[in-house]
Amino acid sequence: MRECIISWTLLLCLSCVKSFNLDVNAPIYRYGPSGTNFGYSVAEHFKGDKPVMLIGAPRGESGQTGTERAGAMYACDINTFYNGGSNHWCEQVRFEYENVEDYAKRPNETRGRTVHPLGKNDQLLASTIVSKGTKNGSALVCAPLIRYHQTAAYPQGACYELESNLRLQSTYATCAQKNLPTTDRHNEYGGCMEGFSAAITQDTIVTGLIGAVKWTGGVFAKKSSANIFDSVVEKYTMNQPNGDMIRTRLVAHDYLGYSVDIGRFGFWYEDGKPITVVSGATRYGEHGAVIFLPFIQDSSSKLTLNEDKFIINGTAMGSAFGYSIEVVDLNGDGFDDLIVGAPFEHRSGIDGNFGGIVYVYFSQGVQRKQHESHLVFHPPKILKNPDFYSQFGLSITKLGNVDGDKSKLNDFAVGAPFAFDGAGAVYIYLGTKNIEKFRKKPAQVIKGNDLPNLPPGGMRSFGFSLSGGSDMDENGYPDLLIGSPSKNFVALLRSRPVISIETKHKMEKRMVDIDKGVNCPRGAKTCFPLDMVIYVDEETKRGAELVDFSSDVFMCNLEAIPFRADTTARGFIEGSHSHNYSWPCGSNSHVQKRTYRQLIYLPVQESKDWITPLKFRFTVSIRNEKKPVQPPQGSQLVDLKHYPVLNKYGASYEFDVPFNTLCGEDHTCQTDLSLKAAFKDIPLTSNGYVSNVGEKDYLDLTFTVENKKEKAYQANFYLEYNEEELELPQVQGSKRMIAETIGKNIVHLPLGNPMNGASKHQFTIQFKLTRGRTEGIGKALKFMAHVNSTSQETEEELKDNKWEAEVQIIKKAELEIYGISDPDRVFFGGKARAESELELEEDIGTMVRHNYTIINHGPWTVRNVEAHISWPYQLRSRFGRGKNALYLLDVPTITTEFTDGTSEVRKCFIKQQYEYVNPAEIKLNTKYSTQETAPHRVEHRMKREIDEDEEEQSDDLGAVEENIPWFSTANFWNLFAIKGGDGRPREVKHLSCQDNTANCFTVICHFDFIDANSAVVIDLRARLWNATFIEDYSDVESVKIRSFGKLQLDESQGIDDDPNNNAAFVETSADPDRPTIGDSRPIPWWIYVIAAVIGVLILSLIIICLSKCGFFKRNRLDQPSLYTAQLKHEREEWADTGL
């Protein structure tokens, strides 16, 4: 419960710091007429000494006869009359004529410069409003599209200088008043659009004319003086000779005058009265630029570039660099700084996507010489907004000293009117004495949708226009006026008073002793007292009288935070035994410093890193802080003096606490670690480290780590290795060193914390090579080791902190492939049947199985092996497709018997399988098929039985006749049929893939691995296509049909294998069945005589034997031929299966 209270207190503190002092709880609103773009421009102004809000509505009605949507300006008092309908809401100011009666006349009927009869329709009056923002100060209001001339309509624009009471003082229509040529209309000065932008200071007025000379643009400036004897100086860029510098640098559509301002930055001529006019040219060079125009009080009216034509260019095409500019002294050095907006510049990077960029150019603070303009500014500070379509930088305004800092530095605001899905936002940035400490992170973010009591539909385009720097409620702090023209809405955000509190810390010792803590809590490695000090700054006590310091008015919070992003928070606070602790504080801190002691300790589990300091954040907030509430329409304003806040950065303080590392006077540990390594019993050859592994299946690596200098804190050793090829390592010879594994393939050994200077560690790490199915593919073994610590080492000393090596492991595995035919001899004969007559597989012919056996004799497992078997499925024919030979019935299968007693059956792969495996779709007898299975346990024969079976299989595939019984019919007829009638031997035919006598396809059988001392069997089941052999080979002695198998190994495994036994063939002899095939060859007469005699003798013996056995008492079936009997027998077997 206590931790929850602390967490909520911290959250409250953080939210208070984030909000800072522009109040969003009780803003002053103004809602304008619908469709008028009320809020398109805003200005903080004083009528005499009375503050008012000047608000432009350029699509409003001016009230002049004969005009439509001419525009209007409203002056609004500081009150809570938010909506129209009340006399206290706002006053529409009529200022275009000295006599208000002229509003009753049509534009072309009034005195003065001739205005086109429709010249004030849509003139965008009050689209630009600027004010000096001081008591009794004047203002400037412009209508850039007012059109002059009786017959032609020239949008030359005009600006109206108003006195403090908003009465017309002067009118500026430079292109018309100076009679600049308009013969070529907009290509000259017929469309100047004066007043598109404007700026005003105590003695200078500047206007922008972006339409001059085909939108090349222009700038007009007027400087006057309170001294009536000083002359008024007017200068402008327009109507300069063609050779003028500004005409040579700018071209059509550069939009000079898009934004304007005045300042003194440090150019050589700014000594005394001269100033510099700055203007944005948003399409200059397609990327935009800021143009600098010296204003020197002389008789010339020419406003042009300085001697070295100094310009600041944008960096991105289409960024509109210079869309908005603001001149303000941010660091109080007496020289103005420049803020430039590029709202359409987009950036994307590893830190995100950004829409709109603002450049802050700090002056160097030095008066430069001629031709040194490039030295006037520092490189810019770049502000970015993470909302891609926000148009961050569309508006910028100075704020004055909004945070009330004692240096009285100016601050500024940036508008992003389309941030947060179009609602809009305003970002507050604070000035700084030290340019390097300028904070790019905003001190406050004001979101349009966060304002209270908004109408239905929420906010849109909040921040489109801004005006700041004036104290509108007279509480001593400047306020901010914000326009939202999409909603015809304006909000005045007032500043809350600031109590400037300062925070710091004190310690008895500058550093923390690692092992010398006093009165530490149980389980702590070390501890130390930490004093936190708070006090109210004496120079800024104007907010101190607003709170009661007789009691603890503040809430203090101390938090241990990470030193860097890659570290964690360390250090526990005894008050809460956690990283975070809060307590009431601050009584009498306005008159004296208050100190609060906290005991900080480090538990043993966090006591490893003694180099990285501890880091803390100390935060102070107002206890039980109250927030103002927006009053209802017409109620009294909330007095923000009763709602002070603490200063943004003084109330939050971060600091480091280092450890005493006992490393010299500077307490910086300069260490020098050295790493050496060597393989045991593996020599280094010209090809690197090469090891032939056999019975020894491990590697030994010996490492030596030495520290040649000061203490190495958190010294560690890391070794990366191939986890697929090596098992978990073991440290040999050092019981004190315990290895741990990081991830899958990194071993880590701590070397000491610290590892003292002049010390050495020597240890051996043993890796066992992986065997079996998890074994890797045999790439070179890579070892990468390095040592490091949190102490410091130079780049030269770091060179020997790493070690790398590769070892090529050569593994022995003896693969062998051999094959057998089952049966090895078959017969063909009978009647040749067409394919369409075949229904059952037995109708095709005799079944033949080719079995290939692959044995891994070890000692290593082999992975990624393929057997490629060439299968003779057709006779070779010059016409392409030949007659069927060995007709493959099933997809070949692989039977694998593993060393753990399990086995499984899988299928091989045949490309275009349906063309080669039973393409005639003849019904198969499943009795003969080998089915796929999952791994299962099988009974294994003894090795002696296997050897006996192997001995029975002849290696001489040509001598298959030895396995045929001597009394078979085929053998008998072969004895007499070896020679033909002409005495020549009968022919023996061969069908094989190697000699191109058969059409073949390839069967691919893939093995993920073959264990050592294990075997796999490939079974190919086919039938001899009887019709083919009857038709083509009836007159031959025998047909030798041969398939061929070859092993392919993955060479990347580094396996040492003898390739001589990686190929084999299987041969089947197909012989004619003589009794069923007519033999037209002549037989000698003496053979008939011998055969008859022998036949009579045999028949007589058989009859005698059978008669004695009672054989003739039973019915006898006629004797079929061998071939017919064989097929009948197979049919009966199939019938027995019930199919």
Curated annotation (Swiss-Prot):
Protein known as: Integrin alpha ina-1
FG-GAP repeats: 21-85, 111-171, 180-231, 242-302, 307-370, 378-438, 448-510
SUPFAM superfamilies in the cross-refs: Integrin alpha N-terminal domain, Integrin domains
Biological processes per GO annotation: animal organ morphogenesis; axonal fasciculation; body morphogenesis; cell adhesion mediated by integrin; cell-cell adhesion; cell-cell adhesion mediated by integrin; integrin-mediated signaling pathway; mesodermal cell migration
Topology term for the membrane: Single-pass type I membrane protein
Gene deletion effect: RNAi-mediated knockdown in distal tip cell (DTC) causes DTC morphological and guidance defects such as precocious dorsal turns, a failure to reach the vulva and a bloated distal gonad. Embryos at the comma, 1.5-fold and 2-fold stages have increased number of cell corpses due to a defect in cell engulfment. RNAi-mediated knockdown with mig-38 results in enhanced gonad DTC migration.
A GO cellular component annotation in the UniProt record: integrin complex
Ranges per topology, Extracellular: 20-1084
Sequence ranges on the Cytoplasmic membrane side: 1107-1139
Protein task: Plays a role in cell migration, axon fasciculation, and morphogenesis. During gonad morphogenesis, involved in distal tip cell (DTC)-mediated guidance of gonad elongation, in maintaining their sharp tapering morphology and in their migration. Involved in the anterior-posterior positioning of QR neuroblast descendants by regulating the migratory speed of QR.p. Probably by acting as a receptor for apoptotic cells, plays a role in the clearance of apoptotic cells during mid-embryogenesis.
Transmembrane regions listed in the UniProt entry: 1085-1106
Upper lineage: Eukaryota, Metazoa, Ecdysozoa, Nematoda, Chromadorea
Subunit annotation: Heterodimer of an alpha and a beta subunit. Alpha ina-1 associates with beta pat-3. Interacts (via cytoplasmic domain) with src-1 (when phosphorylated at 'Tyr-416').
